From Swiss-Prot:
It comes from the Eukaryota. Keywords: Nucleus, Phosphoprotein. Gene3D superfamilies: ph1033 like domains (3.10.590.10). A motif (Nuclear localization signal) lies at residues 5-10. The gene is THYN1. This is Thymocyte nuclear protein 1.
Length: 225
């Protein structure tokens, strides 16, 4: 598989442990508040809770050129489509909570491909997880902007998953539109009232509830607000 330089390192620009079973309507923002924040010393209880956090995701990447340590980290949904079998590894995540979300992903789960840190951020398409978490090779590559000299091959810190393009959204769903629904839903109790995209906006890997995922998909059929 080719190894394009890409991805946000776990946190992004300002565009931005659970017990028992989660119900489909449990809010991802509320769930996140119960998960330890960016701490490498996760307890086994917290790790087990993360596994039940979500089965839908939002994953951010930068569609416009930006040099990081001399390397262009641009990677858009069009770049994903151009990969062999429209599949690639989602590398470069360097935030513990985002990494733990990667480790919680299961084969076949769907994720929104979100264009971030660009002129018009928003949801561009859908992809699916085709390989569960395994060590991120870029942490060991000295010339890679995501190289981590503190990570050892016999005990790697960072993980990645493989993703495959599913389809483009029927229309691009911009951040501004999602934000307008989020603000309205905070008052009415609607599906996006605590969407992590707004409550923890700097996180590059974000869980979605079933309700949030379904609502965002429904926006494809509506005229832009």
């Amino acid at each position: 598989m080719s190894r394009p330089r890409k991805r946000l390192a776990g946190t992004s620009g300002s565009d931005k442990g659970l017990s028992g079973k989660r119900t489909k309507t449990e809010n991802s923002g509320e769930a996140l508040a119960k998960v330890e924040d960016s701490n490498p010393q996760k307890t086994s209880a917290t790790k087990n809770c993360l596994k039940n956090l979500s089965s839908h995701w939002l994953m951010k990447s930068e569609p416009e050129s930006r040099l990081e340590k001399g390397v262009d980290v641009k990677f858009s949904i069009e770049d994903l489509k151009a990969q062999p079998k429209q599949t690639t590894c989602w590398d470069g995540v360097r935030n513990y909570q985002a990494r733990n979300f990667l480790r919680a992903m299961k084969l076949g789960e769907e994720a929104f491909f979100y264009h971030s840190n660009c002129k018009e951020p928003g949801i561009a398409g859908l992809m699916k997880i085709v390989k569960e978490a395994y060590p991120d090779h870029t942490q060991f590559e000295k010339n890679n902007p995501h190289y981590d000299p503190s990570s050892k091959e016999d005990n790697p810190k960072w993980s990645m998953v493989d993703v495959q393009f599913v389809r483009m959204m029927k229309r691009f769903i911009p951040l501004a539109e999602l934000k307008s629904y989020h603000q309205a839903h905070k008052a009415t109790g609607g599906p996006l009232k605590n969407m992590v995209l707004f409550t923890r906006q700097r996180l590059s890997i974000q869980p979605l509830t079933q309700e949030e995922f379904d609502f965002v998909l429904s926006l494809e059929e509506k005229e832009p607000s």
